[in-house]
A protein has these predicted regions:
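Active-site donor-binding segments of glycosyltransferases and PAPS-dependent sulfotransferases
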Residues: 26-97
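Membrane-proximal helix-turn-helix segments that form the acceptor-binding/catalytic region
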Residues: 127-158, 166
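Conserved donor-binding/catalytic core segment of Leloir-type glycosyltransferases
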Residues: 184, 190-226
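Nucleotide-activated donor-binding/catalytic signature segment of Leloir-type glycosyltransferases, i.e.
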Residues: 234-254
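Acidic donor-binding loop of glycosyltransferase active sites
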Residues: 261-273, 286-287
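Short hydrophobic beta-strand element within catalytic cores of glycosyltransferases
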Residues: 287-292, 297-301
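Conserved acidic donor-binding segment of nucleotide-sugar-dependent glycosyltransferases
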Residues: 301-325, 334-340
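A charged, aromatic-enriched C-terminal amphipathic alpha-helix characteristic of glycosyltransferases
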Residues: 323-326, 337-369
Length: 381
């Protein structure tokens, strides 16, 4: 059986790229495809075998301006020739669910998220755009949104990275999905002897992460906040940061995990589809102070969780329910009032339920019937 692994693009490092990397490790004989590829961001195991990219790769600086190439996505995706493959496994938060396969082939899509800027995040993205860009984006979005819905019907079986995403797949595409949480390298996590006096924020510095709320809260409380990550928001965030805020940039794995391990807690303000960063923090036994919506509801056991009874010794964090500095400040103070009651060992054990080995085992089980017999899956199977 010939197999292809298809990822939306390798233009940054994040949870989606980690999933694609694990897929490549699971299936070393599979060929790898992507819409666009920046060699700097291709995982080592994938770069050794090579990636076949779409014709968009020939556009100068395409990996930097890929969002502006939205009108070309449908054509670029459909020009990738996957007819030789019996099983196509896509890792997608973009347009790759629309690849064309043979009628007798099986297409399984591991969906990190429907495209936010086409669906639930459309108006938020539109508001941030210059006036001259709004009309072209609106016209292109209408066309690509229609295509994206049609493309989703080509998939034989969806796997969602969280219950939250499964709900959005159902709402926007009318498709059922199996839920399989993405892989976390929990073995990298370790327990520090004692935390140091700082809070941590980690991730790409982009608008929806709402890092500015964390900065404002820590400015007003006078708490130390260390920020790991780079992105287009960095200049704006630096401009609003007070003396207790420190920007660490991009860290190597060793330094990143050490920074997790010695933080008092992780601060997380985004409404994420899943969110690997909170689990990486918990793999080091550190609590999470998170926005109580989206994927965080599935990865953090909060003491103040609505509709869920969490004992003090089982808690792994605290939620705030409004994306405001005031709500974050209140959550930080609530955490500090009970900080000594958290069990680093219990927090770490909670994170290990999401380990890479668990993901690989379940993924192999999901794919096994189709690998063995090329049986086209039924919806929700």
């Amino acid at each position: 059986m010939r197999m292809a692994i298809v990822h939306h693009w390798f233009v940054t490092r994040g949870g989606g790229e980690r999933v694609a990397e694990v897929f490549a490790e699971m299936f070393p004989e599979a060929d790898v495809f992507a819409l666009l590829t920046d060699p700097e961001f291709v995982p080592e195991g994938i770069s050794k075998r090579g990636v076949t990219s779409s014709f968009l790769q020939r556009i100068p600086k395409a990996t930097r301006i890929h969002r502006h190439l939205l009108p070309l996505y449908p054509l670029a995706v459909e020009q990738l020739d996957l007819t030789p493959y019996d099983l196509v496994l896509t890792s997608d938060s973009g347009p790759m669910k629309g690849v064309l396969t043979r009628p007798d082939a099986v297409h399984v899509c591991y969906c990190h998220s429907p495209m936010r800027y086409l669906w639930d995040g459309y108006h938020s993205y539109l508001r941030t755009m210059p006036m001259l860009a709004k009309i072209p984006f609106a016209l292109a979005s209408h066309y690509v949104r229609t295509w994206d819905y049609i493309a989703a019907q080509r998939v034989n079986h969806f796997i969602a990275n969280s219950n939250y995403v499964a709900g959005r797949i159902s709402h926007y595409y009318g498709r059922e999905s199996t839920v399989l949480y993405p892989p976390i390298d929990t073995a990298r996590g370790y327990l520090a002897d004692a935390p140091e006096d700082y809070y941590l924020a980690a991730g790409r510095l982009v608008p929806y992460k709402r890092t500015e709320l964390l900065i404002e809260a820590c400015n007003r409380l006078g708490r130390r906040l260390r920020i790991v990550g780079v992105g287009p928001e960095i200049a704006r965030l630096r401009a609003m940061a007070g003396p207790t805020i420190e920007f660490l940039g991009a860290l190597n794995n060793h330094d990143l995990w050490r920074t997790y391990a010695y933080a008092r807690a992780l601060l997380f303000a985004a409404e994420e589809d899943f969110g690997m960063v909170p689990l990486e923090s918990q793999a080091c036994g550190r609590p999470v102070i998170a926005y109580g919506k989206g994927g965080s509801l599935e990865t953090v056991r909060a003491r103040n969780s609505r509709g869920q009874d969490v004992e003090a010794g089982e808690a792994t964090g605290v939620f705030f329910y409004e994306q405001t500095p005031e709500a974050i400040m209140e959550a930080i103070l609530a955490f500090e009032a009970t900080e000594d009651e958290y069990s680093p060992r219990a927090i770490q054990m909670h994170a290990r339920q999401f380990d890479t080995a668990v993901f690989v085992d379940r993924m192999r089980g999901i794919l096994a019937p189709w690998q063995q017999g090329s049986v086209v899956p039924q919806e929700g199977e």
